[in-house]
């Protein structure tokens, strides 16, 4: 029957009409939105259009692309130029805790919550924030941040990493107050810090995002024309790349060069290595354009001051397009050392690196010579052991380092080397690695600029606590490592320049001393422990001494552990004897108790037997009396029967006599 509607059809029609009425009511009375001082607060209200989106809101997106699409979909009133930088899971404290996500862009701080179709949307312009503080939930748990504007206070809690979230918001807030905008490099670095290297964007989307950032961002008043020209030149020279950013390069917290097995290299060997190196270096067919050197530490969001000597020598410096890593810039300094000499110091088996490795407790170094690859790059592999003596990481760890000299390098003018190191024995070593990039740029005949940038990369994403532990230990180790490397290079610079000075020219000597006032001021206190005479010493004796110290340490440790084990054995023997005594006493007590129970049972048995005998005797006596009485009664019965018989006989005789007579 096609014309008659079924019961299910009627119910569906009723439900759809009810839903239509509710939807029309919500559309006629939408959730009110109030805007005060660029603080947009969308009042709470049900959202019937986004019922399917409730579950997608709670399921965390895994890539930056998904998060950015959520951000654009949830905050449509924001300018199109705003790009998501970070987002954090948190809760807004109102009458109840509204669990949601906090989205951070360059100029806005937004919050979105969707709990069972009940939406809350808040947008705060960073320039309108008067102050922000770290707070504690219930005055006990340090996981909250309070944002205060001129008109309202917002208390966000339940942060997984409160300090890191606070620092990111605070830095962007300060940039807005100082009227500074993020550069493309800073923007990409912040994305990789928050979302990792896997952003979910293809090459076209990444290029469009970069171009939109460069085109839209206004020039900050505080930025110099040199920075602007540098950015323009960087745009023009972006087609010249030294390496693909998609290739992960392994490195570690401490990277060095040196071969302990060749500790006693002489000048002839170093010259041979120099000739080999020169023969392998390719030359560029195209001259690279000049780009001003920038010293921005992207991770710390502050500008590193350049030396005065670098400014004065910038005319003679052959600058190349710089491509620092997205981590931290640890060294950016001009040294009074030629570019080729700097390369020899850092990337050959030089006495400098052997001495530096010894000071860093690096032993058992084995390295391969530079070999040319098919693509034109050159490769060098090293293995060594790092003595740590840390309770968290152990006594030592093996490491493998791969150094890549790119084909864009020019002999005695420009060197670009990536150092890839992998540690094998530290905790969570399969989760992370670091990449160190060395850029040596010729400034003049006897000067060069050394730039060292480092990035911490992950093979697989660890959970929050492990990641913070890895980053804390890795960055502190890297900072300590490169501080000492810079200090030792300054000492080597001073020694090399003193060696080439003419002692007969006093004025020249004085002028040279005035030139090196910069070095004397910037060398850390650690350099005072070194002397120029130490440079000529080989590192083999130091390494042997380290080995002996480790052997002595191992012997002492074995003795201590043996004593400890012996004490444990004695303690176990004592406990065993005491336990045996306790067991023997328990068994004796058990036997005594058993004997007592047996004796009690025997006495009770004797008493019961006597009573039984007495009872039997009484019963026998009573039975005898009964039998005696029975016999007497039987005898009486017998006598009675005899008398009766006699009576019957007498009667019979009388009857017989009477019959005869009759």
Swiss-Prot record:
Q: What does this protein do?
A: Cholesterol transporter that mediates non-vesicular transport of cholesterol from the plasma membrane (PM) to the endoplasmic reticulum (ER). Contains unique domains for binding cholesterol and the PM, thereby serving as a molecular bridge for the transfer of cholesterol from the PM to the ER. Plays a crucial role in cholesterol homeostasis and has the unique ability to localize to the PM based on the level of membrane cholesterol.
Q: Which domain of life is it from?
A: Eukaryota
For the GRAM domain, which residue ranges apply? 69-136
Which Gene Ontology terms describe the biological processes this protein takes part in? cellular response to cholesterol; intracellular sterol transport
According to UniProt, the name of this protein is Protein Aster-C
Residue ranges for the region (Disordered) are 1-34, 212-237, 249-284
Gene Ontology MF terms in the entry:
cholesterol binding; cholesterol transfer activity
Major subcellular location class: endoplasmic reticulum
* Entry note about domains: GRAM domain binds phosphatidylserine in the PM and mediates protein recruitment to endoplasmic reticulum-plasma membrane contact sites (EPCS) in response to excess cholesterol in the PM. VASt (VAD1 Analog of StAR-related lipid transfer) domain, also known as ASTER (Greek for star) domain is a sterol-binding domain.
One of the Pfam families matching this protein, by short name: VASt
Protein's cellular compartments: Endoplasmic reticulum membrane; Cell membrane
Membrane topology note: Single-pass membrane protein
Sorted keywords for this record are: Cell membrane, Endoplasmic reticulum, Lipid transport, Lipid-binding, Membrane, Transmembrane, Transmembrane helix, Transport
Q: Where is the composition biased (Basic and acidic residues)?
A: 265-276
Q: Return the InterPro entries for the record.
A: Cholesterol_transport, GRAM, PH-like_dom_sf, VASt
Q: What do the Gene Ontology cellular component annotations say? A: endoplasmic reticulum membrane; endoplasmic reticulum-plasma membrane contact site; plasma membrane
Residue ranges of every copy of the VASt domain listed in the record:
326-497
Segments crossing the lipid bilayer: 557-577
- Native organism: Homo sapiens
Spell out the Gene3D superfamilies in the cross-references. Pleckstrin-homology domain (PH domain)/Phosphotyrosine-binding domain (PTB)
């Amino acid at each position: 029957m096609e014309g008659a509607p079924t019961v299910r059809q009627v119910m569906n029609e009723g439900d759809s009409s009810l839903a239509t009425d509710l939807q029309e009511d919500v559309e006629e009375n939408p959730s009110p939105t109030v805007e005060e001082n660029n603080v947009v607060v969308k009042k709470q209200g049900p959202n019937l259009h986004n019922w399917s989106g409730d579950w997608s809101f709670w399921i965390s997106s895994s890539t930056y692309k998904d998060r950015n699409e959520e951000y654009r979909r949830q905050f449509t009133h924001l300018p199109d130029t705003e790009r998501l930088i970070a987002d954090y899971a948190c809760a807004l404290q109102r009458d109840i805790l509204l669990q949601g996500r906090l989205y951070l862009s360059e100029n806005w701080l937004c919050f979105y919550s969707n709990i069972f179709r009940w939406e809350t949307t808040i947008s705060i312009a960073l320039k309108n924030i008067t102050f922000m503080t770290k707070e504690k939930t219930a005055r006990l748990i340090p996981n909250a941040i309070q944002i205060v504007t001129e008109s309202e206070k917002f208390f966000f809690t339940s942060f997984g990493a409160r300090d890191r979230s606070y620092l990111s918001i605070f830095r962007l807030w300060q940039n807005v107050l100082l009227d500074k905008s993020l550069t493309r490099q800073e923007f990409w670095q912040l994305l990789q810090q928050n979302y990792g290297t896997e952003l979910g964007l293809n090459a076209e989307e990444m290029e469009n995002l970069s171009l939109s950032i460069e085109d839209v961002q206004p020039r900050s008043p505080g930025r110099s024309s040199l920075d602007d020209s540098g950015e323009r030149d960087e745009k023009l020279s972006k087609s010249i790349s030294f390496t693909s950013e998609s290739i992960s390069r392994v490195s570690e917290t401490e990277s060095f060069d040196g071969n302990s097995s060749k500790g006693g290299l002489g000048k002839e060997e170093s010259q041979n290595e120099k000739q080999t190196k020169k023969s392998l270096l390719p030359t560029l067919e195209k001259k690279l354009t000049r780009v001003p050197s920038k010293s921005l530490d992207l991770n710390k969001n502050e500008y590193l001051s350049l030396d005065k000597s670098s400014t004065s020598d910038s005319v003679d410096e052959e600058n190349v397009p710089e491509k620092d890593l997205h981590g931290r810039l640890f060294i950016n300094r001009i040294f009074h050392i030629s570019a080729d000499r700097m390369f020899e110091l850092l990337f050959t088996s030089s006495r400098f690196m052997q001495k530096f490795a010894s000071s860093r407790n690096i032993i058992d170094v084995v390295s391969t010579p530079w070999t040319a690859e098919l693509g034109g790059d050159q490769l060098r592999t090293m293995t060594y052991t790092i003595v740590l003596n840390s309770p968290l990481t152990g006594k030592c760890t093996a490491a493998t380092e791969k150094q890549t000299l790119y084909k864009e390098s020019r002999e005695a003018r420009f060197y670009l080397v990536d150092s890839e190191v992998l540690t094998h024995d530290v905790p969570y070593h399969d989760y992370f690695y670091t990449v160190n990039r060395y850029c040596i740029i010729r400034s003049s005949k006897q000067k060069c600029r050394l730039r060292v940038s480092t990035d911490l990369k992950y093979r697989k994403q660890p959970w929050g606590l492990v990641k913070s532990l890895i980053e804390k230990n890795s960055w502190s180790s890297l900072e300590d490592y490169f501080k000492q490397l810079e200090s030792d290079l300054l000492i080597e610079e001073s020694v090399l320049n003193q060696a080439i000075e003419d002692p007969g020219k006093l004025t020249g000597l004085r002028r040279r001393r005035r030139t090196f006032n910069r070095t004397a001021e910037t060398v850390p206190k650690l350099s005072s422990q070194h002397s120029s005479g130490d440079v000529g010493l080989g590192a083999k004796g130091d390494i042997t001494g380290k080995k002996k110290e480790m052997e002595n340490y191992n012997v002492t440790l074995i003795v201590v552990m043996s004593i400890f084990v012996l004490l444990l054995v004695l303690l176990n023997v004592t406990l065993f004897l005491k336990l045996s005594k306790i067991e023997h006493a328990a068994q004796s007590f058990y036997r005594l108790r058993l004997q007592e129970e047996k004796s009690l049972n025997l006495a009770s048995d004797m008493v019961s037997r006597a009573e039984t005998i007495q009872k039997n005797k009484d019963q026998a006596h009573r039975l005898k009396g009964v039998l005696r009485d029975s016999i007497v009664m039987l005898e009486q019965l017998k006598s009675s029967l005899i008398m009766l018989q006699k009576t019957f006989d007498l009667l019979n005789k009388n009857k017989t006599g009477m019959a005869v007579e009759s």
